Swiss-Prot record:
Transmembrane segments: none annotated. It comes from the Bacteria. GO terms for cellular component: cytoplasm; nucleoid. Residues 6-53, 83-126 form the SpoVT-AbrB domain. PROSITE patterns: SPOVT_ABRB (PS51740). CDD domains: MraZ_C, MraZ_N. This is Transcriptional regulator MraZ. The gene is mraZ.
């Protein structure tokens, strides 16, 4: 399942928001009824994980951490301690808890951004600004993708 594109929506007074139909249809087609919501580690946005993607992330993280290492346990605890299990109501809405609205600086207008196997939820005001300048984007992409170490020049 690959989520692509972006969509705008508004939260209501209770913090409920409609999951865009394009993403909802993908989840239904994959029989994913449950989503996991957490604050992004690096940005002021929220991340929705389909349950199967969340489980893969948890397994990957758990495999890299030692249960008997206190620092590893602290990292794991921090990663999983503040998540919400989300289910859509009959209208395709879900509740964003108030603490998450505050963490992501969401007032009312939101932008959903499909980011491969997850969906980000941004404050529209923040998402309206470029994440990176076009020049820097081009340079970074060139650096990452522009060299192919597997190609031999004859």
């Amino acid at each position: 399942m690959r989520f692509l594109g972006n969509s705008e929506a508004k939260t209501d007074a209770k913090g409920r928001v409609f999951l865009p139909a394009v993403f909802r249809k993908q989840l239904q087609a994959a029989s994913q009824e449950c989503l996991i919501l957490r604050k992004d580690t690096y940005q002021d946005c929220l991340v929705l994980y389909p349950e199967n993607v969340w489980n893969e992330q948890m397994n990957e993280l758990r495999c890299k951490l030692n249960r008997w290492n206190s620092r590893h346990q602290m990292i794991f605890r921090q990663f999983v301690s503040d998540v919400e299990v989300i289910t859509l109501d009959g209208n395709g809405r879900f509740l964003i808890p108030k603490r998450y609205l505050k963490l992501a600086k969401i007032q009312q207008d939101v932008r959903f951004i499909g980011l491969d196997d997850t969906i980000e939820i941004w404050s529209k005001e923040i998402a309206d600004k470029p994440f990176i300048t076009p020049e820097d984007f081009g340079k970074e992409l060139e650096e990452i993708m522009g060299t192919n170490n597997n190609v031999e020049i004859e």
